[in-house]
Protein backbone atom coordinates (compact mmCIF):
# COMPACT_ATOMS: atom_id res chain seq x y z
CA UNK A 1 0.00 0.00 0.00
CA UNK A 2 1.37 3.39 -0.91
CA UNK A 3 2.13 5.39 2.19
CA UNK A 4 0.23 8.59 2.84
CA UNK A 5 2.07 11.45 1.19
CA UNK A 6 3.33 14.19 3.45
CA UNK A 7 4.46 17.46 1.93
CA UNK A 8 6.27 20.03 4.03
CA UNK A 9 6.42 23.65 3.00
CA UNK A 10 8.49 26.03 5.10
CA UNK A 11 7.56 29.70 5.14
CA UNK A 12 10.31 32.05 6.24
CA UNK A 13 8.97 35.30 7.62
CA UNK A 14 11.14 38.31 6.88
CA UNK A 15 11.64 40.75 9.74
CA UNK A 16 9.33 43.15 7.95
CA UNK A 17 5.73 44.17 8.44
CA UNK A 18 4.04 46.37 5.87
CA UNK A 19 1.91 49.29 6.98
CA UNK A 20 -0.47 49.44 4.01
CA UNK A 21 -0.90 47.64 0.70
CA UNK A 22 -3.60 47.07 -1.90
CA UNK A 23 -4.26 43.34 -2.38
CA UNK A 24 -6.96 41.32 -4.09
CA UNK A 25 -8.82 41.21 -0.77
CA UNK A 26 -8.74 45.01 -0.55
CA UNK A 27 -6.66 47.73 1.08
CA UNK A 28 -4.79 46.14 4.00
CA UNK A 29 -3.44 48.28 6.83
CA UNK A 30 -1.03 45.82 8.45
CA UNK A 31 0.47 42.61 7.07
CA UNK A 32 3.41 40.22 7.27
CA UNK A 33 5.47 39.07 4.28
CA UNK A 34 6.27 35.35 4.01
CA UNK A 35 8.11 33.31 1.37
CA UNK A 36 6.96 29.70 0.89
CA UNK A 37 9.60 27.08 0.11
CA UNK A 38 8.15 23.77 -0.93
CA UNK A 39 9.87 20.52 0.09
CA UNK A 40 8.31 17.35 -1.34
CA UNK A 41 9.23 13.75 -0.59
CA UNK A 42 7.33 11.26 -2.71
CA UNK A 43 7.26 7.51 -1.93
CA UNK A 44 9.30 5.45 -4.37
CA UNK A 45 7.27 4.75 -7.50
CA UNK A 46 4.48 7.14 -6.50
CA UNK A 47 2.73 9.10 -9.24
CA UNK A 48 3.47 12.82 -9.11
CA UNK A 49 0.23 14.82 -8.87
CA UNK A 50 -0.11 18.48 -9.71
CA UNK A 51 -1.62 18.99 -6.26
CA UNK A 52 -0.85 16.60 -3.41
CA UNK A 53 -3.53 15.00 -1.25
CA UNK A 54 -1.90 16.18 1.99
CA UNK A 55 0.31 19.16 2.75
CA UNK A 56 1.84 20.81 5.78
CA UNK A 57 2.92 24.42 6.13
CA UNK A 58 5.21 25.83 8.80
CA UNK A 59 5.47 29.58 9.26
CA UNK A 60 5.31 32.34 11.83
CA UNK A 61 2.45 34.63 12.75
CA UNK A 62 3.29 37.57 14.97
CA UNK A 63 6.66 35.98 15.59
CA UNK A 64 5.18 32.69 16.82
CA UNK A 65 5.64 29.44 14.83
CA UNK A 66 2.51 27.66 13.61
CA UNK A 67 1.98 24.46 11.65
CA UNK A 68 -0.87 24.38 9.13
CA UNK A 69 -2.10 20.93 8.06
CA UNK A 70 -4.08 20.72 4.80
CA UNK A 71 -5.98 17.94 3.05
CA UNK A 72 -7.48 18.13 -0.42
CA UNK A 73 -11.27 18.52 -0.34
CA UNK A 74 -12.21 15.45 -2.38
CA UNK A 75 -15.92 16.17 -1.89
CA UNK A 76 -15.88 19.63 -3.46
CA UNK A 77 -17.23 18.53 -6.85
CA UNK A 78 -20.01 16.10 -7.65
CA UNK A 79 -18.94 13.19 -9.86
CA UNK A 80 -21.16 14.51 -12.70
CA UNK A 81 -19.89 18.11 -12.49
CA UNK A 82 -20.31 20.15 -15.67
CA UNK A 83 -19.98 23.75 -16.87
CA UNK A 84 -21.93 25.84 -19.36
CA UNK A 85 -20.79 29.04 -21.02
CA UNK A 86 -21.68 30.79 -24.25
CA UNK A 87 -19.75 31.45 -27.46
CA UNK A 88 -19.51 35.00 -28.90
CA UNK A 89 -22.44 34.20 -31.21
CA UNK A 90 -24.56 33.05 -28.28
CA UNK A 91 -24.25 29.27 -28.70
CA UNK A 92 -24.49 27.25 -25.50
CA UNK A 93 -21.35 25.21 -24.76
CA UNK A 94 -21.38 22.55 -22.01
CA UNK A 95 -18.23 20.73 -20.94
CA UNK A 96 -17.37 18.07 -18.37
CA UNK A 97 -13.90 19.06 -17.14
CA UNK A 98 -11.78 16.73 -15.03
CA UNK A 99 -11.81 18.05 -11.48
CA UNK A 100 -10.16 15.20 -9.57
CA UNK A 101 -6.72 16.81 -9.40
CA UNK A 102 -7.91 20.20 -8.16
CA UNK A 103 -6.18 22.63 -5.80
CA UNK A 104 -8.68 23.36 -2.99
CA UNK A 105 -7.97 22.29 0.58
CA UNK A 106 -9.37 22.23 4.10
CA UNK A 107 -7.16 22.20 7.15
CA UNK A 108 -6.34 23.17 10.70
CA UNK A 109 -3.61 24.70 12.82
CA UNK A 110 -1.67 22.15 14.87
CA UNK A 111 -2.46 22.22 18.61
CA UNK A 112 -5.39 24.63 18.05
CA UNK A 113 -8.64 22.94 19.06
CA UNK A 114 -11.04 25.27 17.20
CA UNK A 115 -8.88 26.12 14.21
CA UNK A 116 -10.04 25.83 10.60
CA UNK A 117 -8.55 26.63 7.22
CA UNK A 118 -9.82 26.90 3.66
CA UNK A 119 -7.02 27.35 1.14
CA UNK A 120 -6.58 27.47 -2.63
CA UNK A 121 -3.12 26.31 -3.75
CA UNK A 122 -3.74 26.92 -7.46
CA UNK A 123 -1.36 29.85 -7.92
CA UNK A 124 0.36 30.30 -4.62
CA UNK A 125 -1.58 30.08 -1.38
CA UNK A 126 -4.83 31.99 -1.03
CA UNK A 127 -7.58 31.68 1.55
CA UNK A 128 -8.04 31.96 5.29
CA UNK A 129 -7.23 30.20 8.54
CA UNK A 130 -8.31 30.70 12.13
CA UNK A 131 -5.68 31.07 14.83
CA UNK A 132 -6.36 31.75 18.52
CA UNK A 133 -9.88 32.86 17.74
CA UNK A 134 -8.87 35.36 15.04
CA UNK A 135 -9.33 35.05 11.27
CA UNK A 136 -6.22 35.50 9.12
CA UNK A 137 -6.09 35.81 5.33
CA UNK A 138 -3.20 34.78 3.09
CA UNK A 139 -2.62 35.58 -0.57
CA UNK A 140 0.31 35.90 -3.00
CA UNK A 141 1.98 39.25 -3.51
CA UNK A 142 2.06 39.88 -7.25
CA UNK A 143 5.77 40.58 -7.56
CA UNK A 144 7.83 39.47 -10.60
CA UNK A 145 9.76 36.24 -10.02
CA UNK A 146 8.84 36.19 -6.35
CA UNK A 147 7.15 33.69 -4.04
CA UNK A 148 6.21 36.42 -1.57
CA UNK A 149 2.84 36.14 0.20
CA UNK A 150 1.00 38.46 2.57
CA UNK A 151 -0.55 37.25 5.83
CA UNK A 152 -2.93 39.63 7.61
CA UNK A 153 -5.87 39.72 9.99
CA UNK A 154 -9.38 40.12 8.65
CA UNK A 155 -9.81 43.20 10.84
CA UNK A 156 -6.90 44.90 9.03
CA UNK A 157 -8.73 44.96 5.69
CA UNK A 158 -10.18 48.43 5.12
CA UNK A 159 -13.95 48.14 4.64
CA UNK A 160 -15.12 50.47 1.86
CA UNK A 161 -18.68 50.44 3.16
CA UNK A 162 -19.03 50.27 6.94
CA UNK A 163 -22.84 50.22 6.86
CA UNK A 164 -24.31 46.98 8.24
CA UNK A 165 -25.25 44.39 5.62
CA UNK A 166 -28.13 42.01 5.99
CA UNK A 167 -30.11 39.18 4.45
CA UNK A 168 -33.23 40.29 2.61
CA UNK A 169 -35.39 37.57 4.19
CA UNK A 170 -37.74 39.25 6.65
CA UNK A 171 -40.77 36.99 6.51
CA UNK A 172 -41.46 34.90 9.56
CA UNK A 173 -40.02 31.42 9.76
CA UNK A 174 -41.77 28.59 7.93
CA UNK A 175 -43.60 27.44 11.07
CA UNK A 176 -44.38 30.89 12.42
CA UNK A 177 -47.44 29.84 14.35
CA UNK A 178 -45.49 27.35 16.49
CA UNK A 179 -42.59 27.95 18.89
CA UNK A 180 -39.30 26.40 17.82
CA UNK A 181 -38.84 22.90 19.18
CA UNK A 182 -35.59 21.36 20.29
CA UNK A 183 -34.46 18.39 18.23
CA UNK A 184 -34.99 16.18 21.28
CA UNK A 185 -38.68 17.20 21.48
CA UNK A 186 -39.48 16.21 17.91
CA UNK A 187 -41.10 12.93 16.93
CA UNK A 188 -38.37 11.53 14.70
CA UNK A 189 -37.48 8.18 13.24
CA UNK A 190 -34.51 6.11 14.37
CA UNK A 191 -32.81 6.99 11.10
CA UNK A 192 -33.26 10.71 11.69
CA UNK A 193 -32.08 10.41 15.28
CA UNK A 194 -28.74 9.23 13.95
CA UNK A 195 -28.36 12.57 12.16
CA UNK A 196 -27.71 10.97 8.73
CA UNK A 197 -25.53 12.93 6.40
CA UNK A 198 -27.28 15.08 3.83
CA UNK A 199 -25.93 15.70 0.32
CA UNK A 200 -26.74 18.96 -1.46
CA UNK A 201 -25.86 19.13 -5.15
CA UNK A 202 -25.44 22.86 -5.70
CA UNK A 203 -25.70 24.63 -9.06
CA UNK A 204 -24.08 28.07 -9.35
CA UNK A 205 -25.02 30.66 -11.95
CA UNK A 206 -22.82 33.76 -12.35
CA UNK A 207 -24.35 36.74 -14.15
CA UNK A 208 -22.63 39.01 -16.66
CA UNK A 209 -21.68 41.55 -13.99
CA UNK A 210 -19.81 38.81 -12.13
CA UNK A 211 -17.99 37.80 -15.31
CA UNK A 212 -17.04 41.40 -16.12
CA UNK A 213 -15.76 41.89 -12.57
CA UNK A 214 -13.67 38.72 -12.28
CA UNK A 215 -13.03 37.71 -15.91
CA UNK A 216 -10.66 34.69 -16.02
CA UNK A 217 -10.57 34.57 -12.22
CA UNK A 218 -14.30 33.91 -11.91
CA UNK A 219 -14.11 30.10 -11.81
CA UNK A 220 -11.40 29.96 -9.10
CA UNK A 221 -13.36 32.59 -7.14
CA UNK A 222 -16.50 30.42 -7.24
CA UNK A 223 -14.60 27.22 -6.42
CA UNK A 224 -12.98 28.79 -3.36
CA UNK A 225 -16.37 30.13 -2.20
CA UNK A 226 -17.94 26.67 -2.41
CA UNK A 227 -14.86 25.17 -0.73
CA UNK A 228 -15.47 27.43 2.27
CA UNK A 229 -19.23 26.75 2.25
CA UNK A 230 -18.48 23.01 2.24
CA UNK A 231 -16.29 23.43 5.31
CA UNK A 232 -18.89 25.53 7.15
CA UNK A 233 -21.58 22.87 6.73
CA UNK A 234 -19.43 20.03 8.07
CA UNK A 235 -20.64 20.85 11.59
CA UNK A 236 -24.24 20.31 10.42
CA UNK A 237 -23.33 16.98 8.77
CA UNK A 238 -24.36 18.41 5.39
CA UNK A 239 -22.15 17.88 2.34
CA UNK A 240 -22.27 20.74 -0.19
CA UNK A 241 -20.97 19.58 -3.59
CA UNK A 242 -20.75 21.72 -6.72
CA UNK A 243 -22.55 19.94 -9.54
CA UNK A 244 -22.84 22.70 -12.13
CA UNK A 245 -21.48 26.14 -13.05
CA UNK A 246 -23.18 28.40 -15.61
CA UNK A 247 -21.50 31.67 -16.59
CA UNK A 248 -23.60 34.30 -18.36
CA UNK A 249 -20.67 35.78 -20.27
CA UNK A 250 -22.48 37.78 -22.93
CA UNK A 251 -26.05 38.37 -21.79
CA UNK A 252 -28.02 37.67 -18.64
CA UNK A 253 -30.81 35.11 -19.05
CA UNK A 254 -33.06 37.08 -16.70
CA UNK A 255 -33.33 40.78 -15.90
CA UNK A 256 -31.12 41.03 -12.83
CA UNK A 257 -32.26 44.10 -10.92
CA UNK A 258 -31.61 45.86 -7.63
CA UNK A 259 -34.94 44.74 -6.16
CA UNK A 260 -33.70 41.52 -4.57
CA UNK A 261 -37.15 39.95 -4.16
CA UNK A 262 -37.92 40.44 -7.85
CA UNK A 263 -34.54 39.04 -8.92
CA UNK A 264 -35.09 36.02 -6.67
CA UNK A 265 -38.50 35.34 -8.22
CA UNK A 266 -37.18 35.74 -11.79
CA UNK A 267 -34.25 33.43 -11.09
CA UNK A 268 -36.57 30.85 -9.51
CA UNK A 269 -38.76 30.88 -12.63
CA UNK A 270 -35.73 30.51 -14.97
CA UNK A 271 -34.33 27.72 -12.85
CA UNK A 272 -37.62 25.79 -12.93
CA UNK A 273 -38.25 26.19 -16.66
CA UNK A 274 -34.68 26.04 -18.02
CA UNK A 275 -31.99 24.95 -15.58
CA UNK A 276 -33.74 21.93 -14.07
CA UNK A 277 -34.28 20.52 -17.56
CA UNK A 278 -30.61 21.03 -18.36
CA UNK A 279 -28.94 19.72 -15.21
CA UNK A 280 -30.18 17.70 -12.26
CA UNK A 281 -29.44 19.47 -8.98
CA UNK A 282 -30.95 20.15 -5.56
CA UNK A 283 -30.55 23.90 -5.21
CA UNK A 284 -29.34 26.78 -7.40
CA UNK A 285 -27.76 30.08 -6.36
CA UNK A 286 -27.24 33.17 -8.51
CA UNK A 287 -24.05 35.16 -7.93
CA UNK A 288 -24.33 38.76 -9.04
CA UNK A 289 -22.27 41.94 -8.78
CA UNK A 290 -25.35 44.18 -8.88
CA UNK A 291 -25.96 46.38 -5.82
CA UNK A 292 -29.23 45.29 -4.25
CA UNK A 293 -31.50 47.92 -2.74
CA UNK A 294 -30.63 49.04 0.76
CA UNK A 295 -28.32 46.89 2.88
CA UNK A 296 -29.51 43.58 1.36
CA UNK A 297 -26.73 41.29 0.10
CA UNK A 298 -28.61 38.00 -0.20
CA UNK A 299 -32.01 36.37 -0.24
CA UNK A 300 -33.53 32.88 -0.42
CA UNK A 301 -36.79 31.03 0.11
CA UNK A 302 -37.08 29.41 3.54
CA UNK A 303 -37.55 25.62 3.73
CA UNK A 304 -37.40 25.28 -0.05
CA UNK A 305 -34.73 22.59 -0.54
CA UNK A 306 -35.84 20.00 -3.16
CA UNK A 307 -38.73 22.25 -4.24
CA UNK A 308 -38.67 22.64 -8.03
CA UNK A 309 -40.23 26.10 -7.82
CA UNK A 310 -38.41 27.68 -4.88
CA UNK A 311 -35.06 25.95 -4.14
CA UNK A 312 -32.97 29.00 -5.07
CA UNK A 313 -30.95 31.81 -3.53
CA UNK A 314 -29.20 34.97 -4.68
CA UNK A 315 -25.91 36.39 -3.37
CA UNK A 316 -24.40 39.82 -4.02
CA UNK A 317 -20.63 39.92 -4.50
CA UNK A 318 -20.33 43.01 -2.30
CA UNK A 319 -16.77 42.58 -1.01
CA UNK A 320 -13.42 41.45 -2.37
CA UNK A 321 -12.97 39.08 0.58
CA UNK A 322 -13.95 35.64 -0.74
CA UNK A 323 -14.66 34.24 2.74
CA UNK A 324 -17.32 36.88 3.49
CA UNK A 325 -19.17 36.12 0.25
CA UNK A 326 -18.99 32.41 1.10
CA UNK A 327 -20.56 33.09 4.49
CA UNK A 328 -23.41 34.98 2.81
CA UNK A 329 -23.96 31.99 0.51
CA UNK A 330 -23.89 29.64 3.51
CA UNK A 331 -26.50 31.87 5.19
CA UNK A 332 -28.85 31.75 2.20
CA UNK A 333 -28.34 27.98 1.85
CA UNK A 334 -29.36 27.80 5.49
CA UNK A 335 -32.71 29.33 4.58
CA UNK A 336 -33.13 26.74 1.80
CA UNK A 337 -32.48 24.07 4.45
CA UNK A 338 -35.23 25.38 6.73
CA UNK A 339 -33.08 27.54 9.00
CA UNK A 340 -34.55 30.90 10.03
CA UNK A 341 -32.72 33.90 11.41
CA UNK A 342 -31.32 33.63 14.92
CA UNK A 343 -33.55 35.25 17.51
CA UNK A 344 -33.07 36.45 21.06
CA UNK A 345 -33.53 32.91 22.40
CA UNK A 346 -30.43 31.59 20.60
CA UNK A 347 -27.05 31.04 22.25
CA UNK A 348 -25.23 33.11 19.62
CA UNK A 349 -26.21 36.51 18.24
CA UNK A 350 -23.37 36.84 15.73
CA UNK A 351 -23.53 33.38 14.14
CA UNK A 352 -24.07 32.60 10.46
CA UNK A 353 -27.86 32.92 10.60
CA UNK A 354 -27.90 36.36 12.21
CA UNK A 355 -30.06 38.67 10.07
CA UNK A 356 -27.22 41.20 10.04
CA UNK A 357 -23.78 40.02 8.90
CA UNK A 358 -21.46 40.19 11.90
CA UNK A 359 -18.06 41.88 11.82
CA UNK A 360 -15.93 39.85 11.77
CA UNK A 361 -18.22 37.33 10.07
CA UNK A 362 -18.82 34.06 11.89
CA UNK A 363 -18.47 30.54 10.46
CA UNK A 364 -20.54 28.98 13.30
CA UNK A 365 -24.16 27.91 13.49
CA UNK A 366 -26.16 28.58 16.65
CA UNK A 367 -28.14 26.00 18.60
CA UNK A 368 -31.29 27.42 17.00
CA UNK A 369 -29.96 26.68 13.51
CA UNK A 370 -29.48 23.02 14.37
CA UNK A 371 -33.00 22.82 15.82
CA UNK A 372 -34.59 24.59 12.84
CA UNK A 373 -32.81 22.27 10.40
CA UNK A 374 -33.86 19.11 12.24
CA UNK A 375 -37.44 20.42 12.39
CA UNK A 376 -37.33 20.96 8.63
CA UNK A 377 -36.03 17.44 7.97
CA UNK A 378 -38.78 15.96 10.13
CA UNK A 379 -41.63 18.06 8.72
CA UNK A 380 -40.64 17.99 5.04
CA UNK A 381 -38.52 14.84 4.67
CA UNK A 382 -36.68 16.32 1.66
CA UNK A 383 -35.70 13.26 -0.37
CA UNK A 384 -33.28 14.89 -2.80
CA UNK A 385 -30.64 15.57 -0.13
CA UNK A 386 -30.71 12.06 1.32
CA UNK A 387 -29.03 10.54 -1.74
CA UNK A 388 -25.93 8.66 -0.64
CA UNK A 389 -22.71 8.74 -2.72
CA UNK A 390 -22.63 6.68 -5.88
CA UNK A 391 -22.10 2.93 -5.52
CA UNK A 392 -19.14 3.29 -7.87
CA UNK A 393 -17.31 5.14 -5.10
CA UNK A 394 -16.79 1.78 -3.33
CA UNK A 395 -13.78 0.10 -4.92
CA UNK A 396 -13.50 -3.10 -2.86
CA UNK A 397 -14.83 -6.34 -4.45
CA UNK A 398 -18.56 -6.72 -3.68
CA UNK A 399 -19.54 -9.37 -1.12
CA UNK A 400 -23.23 -10.22 -0.82
CA UNK A 401 -24.29 -10.42 2.81
CA UNK A 402 -21.85 -7.93 4.36
CA UNK A 403 -24.54 -5.22 4.75
CA UNK A 404 -22.63 -2.84 2.48
CA UNK A 405 -24.25 -1.69 -0.75
CA UNK A 406 -21.57 -2.34 -3.36
CA UNK A 407 -21.30 -2.21 -7.13
CA UNK A 408 -23.62 -4.68 -8.84
CA UNK A 409 -25.92 -4.99 -5.80
CA UNK A 410 -29.42 -3.56 -5.52
CA UNK A 411 -29.56 -4.16 -1.77
CA UNK A 412 -27.59 -5.91 0.97
CA UNK A 413 -29.39 -6.72 4.22
CA UNK A 414 -26.91 -9.23 5.59
CA UNK A 415 -27.27 -13.00 5.72
CA UNK A 416 -30.65 -14.66 4.97
CA UNK A 417 -30.96 -15.51 8.66
CA UNK A 418 -30.44 -11.92 9.81
CA UNK A 419 -32.05 -9.94 6.99
CA UNK A 420 -34.78 -7.60 8.27
CA UNK A 421 -35.45 -5.80 4.98
CA UNK A 422 -38.46 -7.29 3.22
CA UNK A 423 -37.73 -5.65 -0.15
CA UNK A 424 -34.40 -7.46 -0.49
CA UNK A 425 -33.62 -11.05 -1.47
CA UNK A 426 -30.74 -11.70 0.91
CA UNK A 427 -29.42 -14.62 -1.14
CA UNK A 428 -28.87 -12.59 -4.32
CA UNK A 429 -28.65 -9.02 -2.98
CA UNK A 430 -31.31 -8.11 -5.54
CA UNK A 431 -34.72 -6.59 -4.94
CA UNK A 432 -37.68 -8.98 -5.10
CA UNK A 433 -39.48 -8.91 -8.45
CA UNK A 434 -42.65 -7.52 -6.87
CA UNK A 435 -40.90 -4.50 -5.34
CA UNK A 436 -42.13 -1.16 -6.68
CA UNK A 437 -40.14 1.17 -4.45
CA UNK A 438 -37.75 1.27 -1.51
CA UNK A 439 -38.23 4.73 -0.07
CA UNK A 440 -40.18 7.92 -0.53
CA UNK A 441 -43.17 9.66 0.97
CA UNK A 442 -45.47 7.46 -1.13
CA UNK A 443 -43.73 4.13 -0.55
CA UNK A 444 -45.08 1.70 2.04
CA UNK A 445 -43.63 -1.78 2.54
CA UNK A 446 -41.94 -1.74 -0.89
CA UNK A 447 -45.15 -0.80 -2.74
CA UNK A 448 -46.64 2.48 -3.90
CA UNK A 449 -49.02 4.02 -1.38
CA UNK A 450 -52.66 4.07 -2.46
CA UNK A 451 -53.78 7.04 -4.55
CA UNK A 452 -55.32 9.79 -2.46
CA UNK A 453 -53.19 9.18 0.63
CA UNK A 454 -51.96 12.51 1.96
CA UNK A 455 -48.17 12.72 1.77
CA UNK A 456 -47.56 16.38 2.55
CA UNK A 457 -49.89 18.31 4.82
CA UNK A 458 -50.74 21.93 4.16
CA UNK A 459 -48.33 24.01 6.22
CA UNK A 460 -50.54 27.09 6.17
CA UNK A 461 -53.82 28.22 4.71
CA UNK A 462 -51.91 29.42 1.64
CA UNK A 463 -50.47 25.96 1.06
CA UNK A 464 -52.15 22.93 -0.51
CA UNK A 465 -51.94 19.40 0.85
CA UNK A 466 -50.50 16.89 -1.64
CA UNK A 467 -51.61 13.27 -2.03
CA UNK A 468 -49.94 10.20 -3.50
CA UNK A 469 -50.81 9.27 -7.08
CA UNK A 470 -50.50 5.51 -6.62
CA UNK A 471 -48.00 5.45 -9.51
CA UNK A 472 -44.90 6.88 -7.85
CA UNK A 473 -42.98 6.73 -4.59
CA UNK A 474 -42.52 10.49 -4.62
CA UNK A 475 -44.97 13.00 -3.26
CA UNK A 476 -46.13 15.38 -6.04
CA UNK A 477 -44.43 18.75 -6.36
CA UNK A 478 -45.26 21.10 -3.52
CA UNK A 479 -47.99 23.46 -4.73
CA UNK A 480 -49.90 26.30 -3.12
CA UNK A 481 -53.03 28.43 -3.46
CA UNK A 482 -53.18 31.26 -5.97
CA UNK A 483 -51.36 34.45 -5.13
CA UNK A 484 -53.71 37.14 -3.86
CA UNK A 485 -56.09 34.87 -1.98
CA UNK A 486 -57.01 36.40 1.44
CA UNK A 487 -55.35 34.74 4.45
CA UNK A 488 -55.01 35.09 8.22
CA UNK A 489 -58.57 36.40 8.58
CA UNK A 490 -58.00 39.02 5.86
CA UNK A 491 -54.85 40.37 7.51
CA UNK A 492 -52.87 39.36 4.45
CA UNK A 493 -52.90 37.84 0.96
CA UNK A 494 -51.25 34.62 -0.14
CA UNK A 495 -47.93 34.89 -1.95
CA UNK A 496 -45.99 31.79 -3.05
CA UNK A 497 -47.52 29.66 -0.32
CA UNK A 498 -46.91 32.15 2.47
CA UNK A 499 -49.07 34.82 4.05
CA UNK A 500 -46.68 37.78 4.39
CA UNK A 501 -47.82 40.26 7.03
CA UNK A 502 -45.82 42.98 8.75
CA UNK A 503 -46.48 41.58 12.22
CA UNK A 504 -44.72 38.29 11.46
CA UNK A 505 -41.86 40.13 9.74
CA UNK A 506 -41.32 42.10 12.96
CA UNK A 507 -41.40 38.89 15.01
CA UNK A 508 -38.75 37.37 12.74
CA UNK A 509 -36.48 40.36 13.36
CA UNK A 510 -37.11 41.08 17.05
CA UNK A 511 -38.87 38.14 18.64
CA UNK A 512 -42.35 37.43 19.94
CA UNK A 513 -42.75 40.78 21.78
CA UNK A 514 -42.35 42.86 18.63
CA UNK A 515 -45.32 44.51 16.94
CA UNK A 516 -45.74 46.78 13.92
CA UNK A 517 -45.01 50.48 14.40
CA UNK A 518 -47.72 53.14 14.38
CA UNK A 519 -48.96 54.50 11.03
CA UNK A 520 -47.13 57.80 11.53
CA UNK A 521 -43.81 55.95 11.68
CA UNK A 522 -44.15 54.93 8.04
CA UNK A 523 -44.42 58.60 6.97
CA UNK A 524 -40.63 58.74 7.41
CA UNK A 525 -40.43 56.77 4.15
CA UNK A 526 -41.43 59.92 2.25
CA UNK A 527 -38.03 61.46 3.11
CA UNK A 528 -36.13 59.57 0.40
CA UNK A 529 -32.89 59.21 2.38
CA UNK A 530 -30.79 56.37 3.79
CA UNK A 531 -33.01 53.97 5.76
CA UNK A 532 -36.19 55.90 4.80
CA UNK A 533 -37.21 55.27 1.20
CA UNK A 534 -39.22 53.01 -1.10
CA UNK A 535 -36.56 51.91 -3.55
CA UNK A 536 -33.06 52.68 -4.70
CA UNK A 537 -32.16 53.60 -8.28
CA UNK A 538 -28.59 54.32 -9.40
CA UNK A 539 -27.46 55.00 -5.81
CA UNK A 540 -30.35 57.45 -5.33
CA UNK A 541 -32.95 56.87 -2.63
CA UNK A 542 -36.46 57.26 -4.06
CA UNK A 543 -39.03 58.50 -1.52
CA UNK A 544 -42.36 56.78 -1.12
CA UNK A 545 -45.52 58.49 -2.26
CA UNK A 546 -48.05 58.93 0.54
CA UNK A 547 -50.05 55.91 -0.63
CA UNK A 548 -46.90 53.73 -0.79
CA UNK A 549 -45.32 54.43 2.62
CA UNK A 550 -46.11 50.94 3.92
CA UNK A 551 -44.09 49.40 1.08
CA UNK A 552 -40.83 51.03 2.17
CA UNK A 553 -38.98 50.76 5.49
CA UNK A 554 -40.53 48.36 8.00
CA UNK A 555 -41.02 49.85 11.47
CA UNK A 556 -41.37 47.66 14.55
CA UNK A 557 -41.14 48.22 18.29
CA UNK A 558 -41.25 46.23 21.49
CA UNK A 559 -44.48 46.30 23.49
CA UNK A 560 -42.54 47.43 26.58
CA UNK A 561 -40.89 50.34 24.78
CA UNK A 562 -42.71 53.68 24.63
CA UNK A 563 -40.68 54.91 21.64
CA UNK A 564 -43.12 53.62 19.03
CA UNK A 565 -40.98 54.66 16.05
CA UNK A 566 -37.72 53.32 17.40
CA UNK A 567 -35.52 51.53 14.86
CA UNK A 568 -31.95 50.28 14.80
CA UNK A 569 -29.45 48.44 12.61
CA UNK A 570 -31.07 45.09 13.25
CA UNK A 571 -34.27 46.42 11.69
CA UNK A 572 -33.21 47.74 8.33
CA UNK A 573 -35.40 45.57 6.14
CA UNK A 574 -37.86 46.64 3.50
CA UNK A 575 -41.47 45.43 3.69
CA UNK A 576 -41.75 42.11 1.86
CA UNK A 577 -43.09 41.82 -1.66
CA UNK A 578 -46.74 40.68 -1.47
CA UNK A 579 -47.38 42.18 1.99
CA UNK A 580 -50.76 43.79 2.60
CA UNK A 581 -50.37 47.59 2.65
CA UNK A 582 -54.06 48.57 2.65
CA UNK A 583 -57.43 46.90 2.25
CA UNK A 584 -57.39 45.08 -1.09
CA UNK A 585 -53.82 46.17 -1.82
CA UNK A 586 -50.32 44.65 -1.62
CA UNK A 587 -46.74 45.85 -2.18
CA UNK A 588 -45.49 45.05 -5.67
CA UNK A 589 -41.89 44.67 -6.83
CA UNK A 590 -41.53 48.42 -7.46
CA UNK A 591 -42.63 49.21 -3.90
CA UNK A 592 -46.01 50.56 -4.90
CA UNK A 593 -49.17 49.73 -2.96
CA UNK A 594 -51.37 48.34 -5.74
CA UNK A 595 -54.67 46.54 -6.19
CA UNK A 596 -54.26 42.85 -5.35
CA UNK A 597 -56.47 41.85 -8.28
CA UNK A 598 -54.07 43.35 -10.83
CA UNK A 599 -50.61 42.61 -9.42
CA UNK A 600 -50.64 38.80 -9.86
Swiss-Prot record:
Q: Which residues form the active site?
A: 332
Q: Which residues carry this modification: Pyrrolidone carboxylic acid?
A: 192
Q: Name one GO cellular component term.
A: extracellular region
Gene3D superfamilies cross-referenced by the UniProt entry: Collagenase (Catalytic Domain), Disintegrin domain
Q: Where does Zn(2+) bind?
A: 331, 335, 341
**Binding-site residues for Ca(2+), renumbered to this chain:** 399, 402, 404, 406, 409, 412
S-S pairs: 306-384, 346-368, 348-351, 400-429, 411-424, 413-419, 423-446, 437-443, 442-468, 455-475, 462-494, 487-499, 506-556, 521-565, 534-544, 551-587, 581-593
Q: Where is this motif: D/ECD-tripeptide?
A: 461-463
GO molecular function, a single term? metalloendopeptidase activity
Can you give the propeptide residue ranges? 21-191
> What EC number(s) is this enzyme filed under?
3.4.24.-
Chain positions carrying an annotated carbohydrate: 317, 367, 568
| Key words of the record | Calcium, Cell adhesion impairing toxin, Disulfide bond, Glycoprotein, Hemostasis impairing toxin, Hydrolase, Metal-binding, Metalloprotease, Platelet aggregation inhibiting toxin, Protease, Pyrrolidone carboxylic acid, Secreted, Signal, Toxin, Zinc, Zymogen
What does the UniProt entry say about where the protein is found? Secreted
Q: Which cofactor does it need?
A: Zn(2+)
The GO annotation for biological process reads: proteolysis
This molecule's function is given as: This metalloproteinase-disintegrin-like impairs hemostasis in the envenomed animal.
Member of which family?
Belongs to the venom metalloproteinase (M12B) family. P-III subfamily. P-IIIa sub-subfamily.
| Binding partners and assembly | Monomer.
Q: This protein is called what?
A: Zinc metalloproteinase-disintegrin-like stejnihagin-A
Q: Which organism is it from?
A: Trimeresurus stejnegeri (Chinese green tree viper)
Amino acid sequence: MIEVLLVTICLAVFPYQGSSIILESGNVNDYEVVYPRKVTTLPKGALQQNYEDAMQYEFKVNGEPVVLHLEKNKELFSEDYSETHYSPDGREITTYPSVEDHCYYHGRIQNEADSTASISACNGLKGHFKLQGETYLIEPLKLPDSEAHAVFKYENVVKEDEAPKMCGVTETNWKSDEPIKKASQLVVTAEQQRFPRRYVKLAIVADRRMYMKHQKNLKPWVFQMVNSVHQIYRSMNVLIALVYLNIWKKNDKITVQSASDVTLDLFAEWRETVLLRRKKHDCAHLLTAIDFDGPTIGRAHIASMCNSKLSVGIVQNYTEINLVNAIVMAHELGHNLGISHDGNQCNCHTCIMSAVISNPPSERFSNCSEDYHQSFLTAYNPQCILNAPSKTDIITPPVCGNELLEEGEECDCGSPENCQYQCCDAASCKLHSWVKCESGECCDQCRFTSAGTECRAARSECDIAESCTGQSADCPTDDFHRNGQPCLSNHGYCYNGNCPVMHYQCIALFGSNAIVGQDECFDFNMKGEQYFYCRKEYEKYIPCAQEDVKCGRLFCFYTNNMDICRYNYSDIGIVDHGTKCADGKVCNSNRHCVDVTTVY
